[in-house]
Amino acid sequence: MPRRGPVTPREIPPDPVYNSVLVQKLINKVMLDGKKSIAEKIVYGAMEIIREKTKQDPLVVLEKAVQNVTPLLEVRPRRVGGATYQVPIEVPPRRGLSLALRWIVRAARERKGMPMKERLALEILDALNNTGGAIKKRDEMHRMAEANKAFAHYRW
């Protein structure tokens, strides 16, 4: 904990098109080297692709996809005696949202052979249908937590 007192989370203004903090956070995660206008084009392009493919409001689709990817448990290392145990703990909502967006963007970047807006749109649609790289990452994290359930009493 810092000596200057508790850290207050920064207030993120909603994006101008969808008036959503979630979309603004996604834009910030997509952004590389401070190039926000490029990140905005990618995200808004992906949202248009989602609108065309699903015939639904892309904001609702994005919220559901992020909800599907958000992990409930994660493991944290804890040293006890001479051994380091992987202790499963619940993920706080802010961290869960951050992890979900990070995994969606990473999975989209790992897809190859098409523009980033298409890759992002496909990854969001996959997350909506509980498939894709981001869901695989969440399941892997849940499996690790399940495997280390015996160490849950070391929680702090």
Swiss-Prot record:
UniProt xrefs under PROSITE patterns: RIBOSOMAL_S7
Keyword Iron belongs to the record: no
GO biological process, one term: translation
Keywords: Ribonucleoprotein, Ribosomal protein, RNA-binding, rRNA-binding, tRNA-binding
Entry's Gene Ontology molecular function annotations: rRNA binding; structural constituent of ribosome; tRNA binding
Taxonomic superkingdom: Bacteria
Keyword Amino-acid biosynthesis: no
Signal peptide: none
GO cellular component, one term: small ribosomal subunit
Function recorded in the entry: One of the primary rRNA binding proteins, it binds directly to 16S rRNA where it nucleates assembly of the head domain of the 30S subunit. Is located at the subunit interface close to the decoding center, probably blocks exit of the E-site tRNA.
Family: Belongs to the universal ribosomal protein uS7 family.
Subunit structure as annotated in this protein's UniProt entry: Part of the 30S ribosomal subunit. Contacts proteins S9 and S11.
Protein name: Small ribosomal subunit protein uS7
Organism: Dictyoglomus thermophilum (strain ATCC 35947 / DSM 3960 / H-6-12)
